[in-house]
């Protein structure tokens, strides 16, 4: 709700740090936010019947074109930053290297599709090595226009303090038994 409030009041921050214990849904939330941002118009233009009401949820239909493109990792407005392959290419590297972060430069050099937003998901920011963390920090200090960076972190205390200070934090916690029961009931389970 904090993210949606910021969106609906026009105070959408360029950097969001999504934190919480492993398995709580941080990456899932990052993908939902990305889908929402890429599928929702930048400006609520007034049409024949006035401006549409502000969105109440982050829900985007699974058959929406943006949903399909994100599922295929082919949306031009999304950049996924995660550990890449080792030099041998036989497994994933132990950390996100600065060479992976530099690829963001090419992404930002292109204008956003349809003049819309660009979204970067860093999953997980805990995996950034020192040089990569400093490169991300520079982008957070001078963000490109209409870009939102979503940093997933299991241990935010391990990140550079300056990265934490440049982001708004969304702290996730496991659902309690009553909240879990309500969620299951709402889902029809």
Task: Describe the predicted segments one by one.
Residues 1-131:
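Clamp-loader machinery-focused feature within the broader ASCE/P-loop NTPase space
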Residues 24, 85-189:
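Non-catalytic interfacial helical region
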